[in-house]
Amino acid sequence: MSQQRTLNNTIRATGVGLHSGNKIHITLRPAPVNHGIVFRRVDLDPVVEIPASGDLVTEVILCTGLTRNGAKVQTVEHLMSAFAGLGIDNAIVDLSSAELPIMDGSSAPFVFLLQSAGILEQNAAKRFIRIKRSVEVRQGDKVAKFSPYDGYKLGFTIEFDHPMIPHKQSHYEMEFSTAAYIKEISLARTFGFMHDLEDMRERNLGLGGSMDNAILLDDFRVLNEDGLRYGNEFVRHKILDAIGDLYLIGGPILGAYEAFKSGHALNNKLVRAVLADETSWEWISFPSSAAEQPPVVYTHPACI
């Protein structure tokens, strides 16, 4: 049986908000079966709970943000990506601010936190969303698409007119699994261009950004002294973001995702398009008595 998962223990961390620049405290807690991922704004009175749901997405410029009852939580994509990568179905995320900490700009610190807390398999079958027929959304020349597939596969193409992002480094595909996610995706950092930085600061965005938590490029080169973690780190980070954005669909996915120049807005548009068309997907579980077995996607917790 492919079982639901939560954390074995509570774990805490502190970091800086990418856009606010504020110090943020985050606490990750176990949650019961079928609870899902829920963010809690514990700095508010009363505390506001915000489920990790695609239909609550209200912010898609430079991050993915959720809003419920007037309370916001922004920059959820990297933690959601880590949850998806390790197969965590149920968790409570307490926040002292309206934004998650950016950590080092990748999801690797969140993966480390989850591994440190331990992963607990629960006595209930994991519920997958299986794509039954293709769904595609477009915005100008940008495209994002889901197709039926026995497993979870992601392919992404970016297009930037920059010498550090040549065409041969602009496409990446991966067969999703916990091991592949940790090794190939989790270390890829968010990135930005110097010429965009001033505009962002004028809009009170990117106030916590630095070369400690992002790749920064001028017109010709990467400015970070340590360079890149992968030769194609830019497109790998886009897949990292997509994995987090798509996990807001409400569960792990069985299907193939293909994207060209997609971002948070189009990823959310795809999630909403799938959920709005009940003929395009179905819930499926793989109890121990089932004749059909789940694709090998998630590594056993003892091996993570």
From Swiss-Prot:
Q: Which residues does the entry assign to the active site, renumbered to this chain?
A: 264 (proton donor)
Q: Give GO BP annotations, semicolon-separated.
A: lipid A biosynthetic process
Q: What's in the keyword line of the UniProt record? A: Hydrolase, Lipid A biosynthesis, Lipid biosynthesis, Lipid metabolism, Metal-binding, Zinc
Q: Which InterPro entries match?
A: Ribosomal_Su5_D2-typ_SF, UDP-acyl_GlcNac_deAcase, UDP-acyl_GlcNac_deAcase_C, UDP-acyl_N-AcGlcN_deAcase_N
Source organism? Xylella fastidiosa (strain 9a5c)
Top class in the EC scheme: hydrolase
**Sequence positions that bind Zn(2+):** 78, 237, 241
> What protein name does the entry list?
UDP-3-O-acyl-N-acetylglucosamine deacetylase
